[in-house]
């Protein structure tokens, strides 16, 4: 069957949520009902097609974002199923960067959970329009209306309810469609593939009319024609109402809310309708800003098939059959195999060989891709996550992605000489795939240090190293990735001077060091005027600071959240060089640390604990003993929900302790919140161990 693949018929969406909310289960139903696959893969059976890694099948969780394409009502839908576990947040981040819309899946019992908040904020960051799907409405304790309230309270969003559940918990059978004012009931015998429309149950008519009125009040505000009809008391057609909702979603004025039970095969087809009806096409999104490399001016890139080729690489992975795969989102133009493109970030060319459409880890060769497409390119040599690919005659750079700092590290030692050789190759490939993974060598012990986002993240990396690269290694106990920063502004003058006979080394720098707000990272600025330092030497100053800040003077941890401004300096016509200025910058940094009030920072985790009432006292007492602070407590049915902030250093082994104090009935989830100053007594111990 031929299909119109023009931009208006394309949707690029992500499925995002907290772990265990049902993202992958929802995606599997979407693939089944759209005909992409003829069977339903269940997560709990390790058979979900989108969870193709061995680690995903064993753990029943999504670890890496998986891409696929399906068709619904004449529209092409490119889907990325993202992880819900906090350790793999980077997969959500880079997926949202290239998506036009998203479906946020919520557990109908738990509502808005901590990682739900994290991915929602990430979607806010990239202005991604979204739809809410309240899943698991068949489960005991499911409460649709409380979930809608939590969207307002916790996410600060404006929900637009389009459906109401018919029946509660095990009696959930279908939904009330508030657009058409009818019921939709699913047929169990057909695995939910068939359903029928009917009258709204009499006991729900009043509530349906109440929410229909709320829907109309919000939707008509964006359309004069609809607003006039509404105030005149006249009927508003479904097509006009959908047009109003679509405009509101694209402008992020509100978020449509639907409900269902993906596992019980109810509610997925209307969700697909909503994706097509309300989420934006590539040509609906605002023009993207880019840097014109030739002029250094900011330009706007319009999503157009007829424009010049522009794409962003958002993911790199290794495929054992194909080799290196680079996932790209094409924003403009066309890309054909056997052509050459420019990596504008690296200022190098890449030859395009195979262009692949992906379905999880299955590949389909195509000869051409165009604006709006998400495809994988085989065999690129230099391109990494965040690089821009474009035509040779129009070098431009799209806004790059920001990645979080690792919060945990482990020492990795190969068991044999053969393992040592393979480990270097394995880790270099894994680091290239995952921007949230870091690697360095401890200069004192010679150990390889692997840095990641949490215990599970590092555990999966080590497991992949063993399975995919046949590397056996001894693994050290996880350690907290502390950081250092400064608390005072100070200007340092430093002269680097060295005479060795013949040409010497000379560089003088005046650098103003200033503390920055948490999360700012490192910033460098040059305010050199009048040729005090030739411009070709200034990158040496920045490189010197970048290199030395990786190992602070206080305890040897990276220094973050500060700005260095090069305000003055001097050079020698013969003895100055970029290396001399790099060494001068390092000397200035060493002098600065002792004068700028250096402090040690530790990662603080936001922890949500769900516990039966009778264990709440023990749980709170334990939080206090871990240097934690309770921020909020809520009732949720017969349990208490405790929101706390606890240092990561005190969270090792917490799952075992929590099970012990609650007889296995309490559970928790955590994710990175911020870095905070370490108490003085802890600083002393940490410096001693370093």
From Swiss-Prot:
Function: Catalyzes the GTP-dependent ribosomal translocation step during translation elongation. During this step, the ribosome changes from the pre-translocational (PRE) to the post-translocational (POST) state as the newly formed A-site-bound peptidyl-tRNA and P-site-bound deacylated tRNA move to the P and E sites, respectively. Catalyzes the coordinated movement of the two tRNA molecules, the mRNA and conformational changes in the ribosome.
Name by which UniProt lists this protein: Elongation factor G
Sequence positions that bind GTP: 17-24, 81-85, 135-138
Record-level GO BP terms: ribosome disassembly
Cleavable signal peptide: none
Keywords of the record: Cytoplasm, Elongation factor, GTP-binding, Nucleotide-binding, Protein biosynthesis
Gene: fusA
Coiled coil: none
A GO cellular-component term linked to this record: cytoplasm
SMART domains xref list: EFG_C, EFG_IV
GO molecular function annotations of the record: GTP binding; GTPase activity; translation elongation factor activity
Organism: Ehrlichia chaffeensis (strain ATCC CRL-10679 / Arkansas)
């Amino acid at each position: 069957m031929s299909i119109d693949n023009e931009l208006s018929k394309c949707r690029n969406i992500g499925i995002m949520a907290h772990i265990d909310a049902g993202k992958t289960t929802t995606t599997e139903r979407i693939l089944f009902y759209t005909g992409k696959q003829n069977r339903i893969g269940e997560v709990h059976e390790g058979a979900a097609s989108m969870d193709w890694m061995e680690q995903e099948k064993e753990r029943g969780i999504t670890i890496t974002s998986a891409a696929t394409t399906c068709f619904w009502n004449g529209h092409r839908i490119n889907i990325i199923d993202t992880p819900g576990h906090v350790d793999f947040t980077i997969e959500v981040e880079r997926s949202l960067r290239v998506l036009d819309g998203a479906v946020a899946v919520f557990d109908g019992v738990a509502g808005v959970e901590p990682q739900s908040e994290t991915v929602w904020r990430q979607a806010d960051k990239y202005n991604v329009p979204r739809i809410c799907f309240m899943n698991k409405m068949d489960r005991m304790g499911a409460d649709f209306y409380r979930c809608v309230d939590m969207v307002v309270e916790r996410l600060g969003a404006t929900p637009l309810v389009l459906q109401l559940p018919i029946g509660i918990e095990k009696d959930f059978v279908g939904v009330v469609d508030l657009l058409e004012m009818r019921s939709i009931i699913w047929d169990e015998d057909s695995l939910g593939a068939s359903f029928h429309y009917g009258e709204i149950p009499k006991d729900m008519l009043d509530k349906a009319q109440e929410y229909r009125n709320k829907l109309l009040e919000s939707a008509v505000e964006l359309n004069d024609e609809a607003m006039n009809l509404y105030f005149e008391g006249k009927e508003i057609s479904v097509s006009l109402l959908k047009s109003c909702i679509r405009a509101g979603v694209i402008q992020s004025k509100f978020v449509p809310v639907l409900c269902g039970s993906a596992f019980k095969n109810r509610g997925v087809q209307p969700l697909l309708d909503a994706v097509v009806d309300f989420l934006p096409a590539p040509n609906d999104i605002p023009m993207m800003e880019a840097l014109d490399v030739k002029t250094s001016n900011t330009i706007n890139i319009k999503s157009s098939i007829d424009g010049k080729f522009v794409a962003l690489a958002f993911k790199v992975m290794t495929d054992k059959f194909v080799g290196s795969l680079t996932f790209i989102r094409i924003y403009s133009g066309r890309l054909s195999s056997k052509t050459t493109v420019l990596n504008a970030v690296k200022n190098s060319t890449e030859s395009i060989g195979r262009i692949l459409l992906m379905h999880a880890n299955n590949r389909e060769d195509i000869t051409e891709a165009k604006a709006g497409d998400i495809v994988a390119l085989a065999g690129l040599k230099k391109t990494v996550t965040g690089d821009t690919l474009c035509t040779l005659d129009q070098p431009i750079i799209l806004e790059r992605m920001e990645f979080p700092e690792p919060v945990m590290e482990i020492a990795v030692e190969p068991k044999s000489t053969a393992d040592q050789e393979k480990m270097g190759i394995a880790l270099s490939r894994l680091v290239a795939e995952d921007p949230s993974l870091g690697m360095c060598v401890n200069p004192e012990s010679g150990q390889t240090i692997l840095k990641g986002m949490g215990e599970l993240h590092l555990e999966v990396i080590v497991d992949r190293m063993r399975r995919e690269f046949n590397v056996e290694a001894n693994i050290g106990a996880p350690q907290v990735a502390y950081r250092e920063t400064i608390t005072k502004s100070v200007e340092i003058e430093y002269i680097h001077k060295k005479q060795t006979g013949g040409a010497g080394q000379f560089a003088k720098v005046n650098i103003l060091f200033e503390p920055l707000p948490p999360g700012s990272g490192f910033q460098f600025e040059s305010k050199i005027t009048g040729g005090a330092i030739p411009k070709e030497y200034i990158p040496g100053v920045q490189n010197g600071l970048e290199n030395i800040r990786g190992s602070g003077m206080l305890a040897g941890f990276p220094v973050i959240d500060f700005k260095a401004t090069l305000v003055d300096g001097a050079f020698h016509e013969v003895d100055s060089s970029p290396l001399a200025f790099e060494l001068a910058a390092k000397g200035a940094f060493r002098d600065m640390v002792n004068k700028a009030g250096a402090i040690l920072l530790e990662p603080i985790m936001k922890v949500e604990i769900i516990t039966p009432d009778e264990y709440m006292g023990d749980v709170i007492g334990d939080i206090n003993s871990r240097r934690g602070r309770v921020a909020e407590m809520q009732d949720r049915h017969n349990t208490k929900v405790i929101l706390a902030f606890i240092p990561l250093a005190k969270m090792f082994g917490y799952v075992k302790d929590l099970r012990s104090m609650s007889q296995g009935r309490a559970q928790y989830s955590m994710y990175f919140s911020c870095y905070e100053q370490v108490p003085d007594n802890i600083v002393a111990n940490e410096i001693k161990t370093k």
